């Protein structure tokens, strides 16, 4: 496994602890005497005005539209690198996690739709349980240390990247608002400029960021979700260059700490604060949170494992080296940790759906993701060989 992937796995696993702390802090504040201050902080208006450009949004939307665009820029860089030289660079390597990712998105979406098909507003949340939070999933896996085979970590990483790619497509197709043709035209022009820069071998990251900023503003104003600008810029950064060995890897390395230790924890803090006041068992079992909980905890492992098993049995794909189906099943449960990615989709799905839909969806995400983390950890602990014990025995 390359040094880049090793560093990535180590960093993302460590950030999971900070994510948990950020989410817990948000929950504590939302259910304490500081709830009003917490909400007021998120509602703080932040205005940026440059000549005719005027962007005035609450802090919450700056986090969701701005900071998360940087996160999706990183996702774009990761997907491109893996497709060119990593775990997704060959058909044999990519087939198994790709098929698993498709199953892991379809089954949760169908389960959610089953419980919410009659509610027009709730139906918009069908993609919420389809996402996987790679930081949390790798963080849980890291608790088992060297017992986890490298090939199993790479499988989870590749699956999560495919999952992210699916989320990007879903956002583009299903969560786009009424379009502004003028802003969209500027966005297309900025994209073509980035493509031209890539084709002519431009490798100065600063120029890509400058055009990328124009693209982000245009996409923000167009009605398409602004995070897609980050993905586009990520795909346009060249893997190799004349001045720099790899502009893509250089930018990826620079963004990882900011994403792991600031952007995702800040997003978790801003979106995980669910007030539990007046929420009882009946609320927890209402269609929206129930569909999300079952989608994450039941649908994810059902979809990932079943379609993976069928693909191997039918000869369409093959298991990674040194990995068995028990371990794949355990990892498929960990894929039900939706958390930040699920909350991001929920913020888009219920942006205009009312307070209850937003709160109930976050509640379902928290419960479903927690169950997936606990059960997934226990299942993986049972499925993995006790390598450390074996090594200590050999030394006697």
UniProtKB/Swiss-Prot annotation:
Keyword Transferase attached: no
Residue intervals passing through the bilayer: 16-36, 59-79, 95-115, 124-144, 154-174, 178-198, 213-233, 254-274, 278-298, 328-348, 363-383
Record keywords, A-Z: Antiport, Cell inner membrane, Cell membrane, Ion transport, Membrane, Sodium, Sodium transport, Transmembrane, Transmembrane helix, Transport
Localization: Cell inner membrane
GO molecular function, one term: sodium:proton antiporter activity
Gene3D superfamilies: Na+/H+ antiporter like domain
Gene Ontology cellular component annotations, sorted alphabetically: plasma membrane
Pfam families, alphabetized: Na_H_antiport_1 (PF06965)
Membrane topology listed for this record: Multi-pass membrane protein
One of the GO biological process terms: regulation of pH
Signal peptide: none
Catalyzed chemical reaction(s): Na(+)(in) + 2 H(+)(out) = Na(+)(out) + 2 H(+)(in)
Keyword Coiled coil: no
InterPro entries found in the cross-reference section: Na/H_antiporter_dom_sf (IPR023171), NhaA (IPR004670)
Family: Belongs to the NhaA Na(+)/H(+) (TC 2.A.33) antiporter family.
PANTHER family with a match to the protein in the record: NA(+)_H(+) ANTIPORTER NHAA, SODIUM ION/PROTON ANTIPORTER NHAA-RELATED
Function: Na(+)/H(+) antiporter that extrudes sodium in exchange for external protons.
Protein name as it appears in the record: Na(+)/H(+) antiporter NhaA
């Amino acid at each position: 496994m390359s040094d880049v992937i090793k560093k990535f796995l180590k960093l993302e696993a460590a950030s999971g602890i900070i994510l948990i702390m950020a989410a817990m802090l948000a929950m504590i504040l939302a259910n304490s005497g500081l709830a009003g201050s917490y909400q007021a902080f998120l509602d703080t208006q932040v205005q940026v005005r440059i000549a005719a450009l005027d962007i005035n949004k609450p802090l919450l939307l700056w986090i969701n539209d701005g900071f998360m665009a940087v996160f999706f820029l990183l996702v774009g860089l990761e997907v491109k690198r893996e497709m060119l030289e990593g775990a997704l660079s060959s058909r044999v390597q990519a087939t198994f996690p790709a098929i698993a990712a498709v199953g892991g998105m379809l089954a949760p979406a169908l389960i959610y739709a089953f419980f919410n098909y009659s509610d027009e507003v709730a139906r918009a949340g069908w993609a919420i349980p389809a996402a996987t939070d790679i930081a949390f999933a790798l963080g849980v896996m890291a608790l088992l240390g060297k017992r986890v085979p490298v090939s199993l970590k790479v499988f989870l990483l590749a699956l999560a990247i495919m999952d992210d790619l699916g989320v990007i497509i879903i956002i583009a197709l299903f969560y786009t608002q009424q379009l502004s043709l003028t802003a969209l035209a500027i966005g297309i022009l900025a994209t073509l400029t980035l493509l031209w820069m890539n084709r002519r071998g431009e490798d100065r990251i600063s120029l890509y960021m400058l055009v990328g900023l124009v693209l982000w503003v245009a996409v923000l104003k167009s009605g398409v979700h602004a995070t897609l600008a980050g993905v586009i810029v990520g795909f346009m950064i060249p893997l190799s260059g004349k001045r720099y060995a790899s502009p893509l890897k250089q930018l990826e390395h620079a963004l990882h700490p900011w994403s792991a230790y600031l952007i995702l924890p800040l997003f978790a803090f801003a979106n995980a604060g669910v007030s539990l006041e007046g929420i009882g068992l009946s609320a927890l079992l209402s269609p929206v949170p129930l569909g999300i909980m079952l989608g994450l905890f039941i649908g994810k492992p059902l979809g990932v494992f079943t379609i993976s098993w069928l693909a191997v049995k039918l000869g369409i794909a093959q298991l990674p080296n040194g990995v068995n189906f028990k371990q794949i099943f355990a990892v498929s449960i960990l894929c039900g940790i939706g958390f930040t990615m699920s909350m991001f989709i929920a913020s888009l799905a219920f942006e205009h759906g009312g307070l209850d839909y937003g709160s109930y969806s976050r509640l379902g995400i928290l419960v479903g993701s927690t169950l997936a983390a606990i059960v997934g950890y226990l299942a993986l602990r049972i499925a993995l060989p006790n390598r450390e014990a074996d090594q200590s025995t050999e030394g006697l």
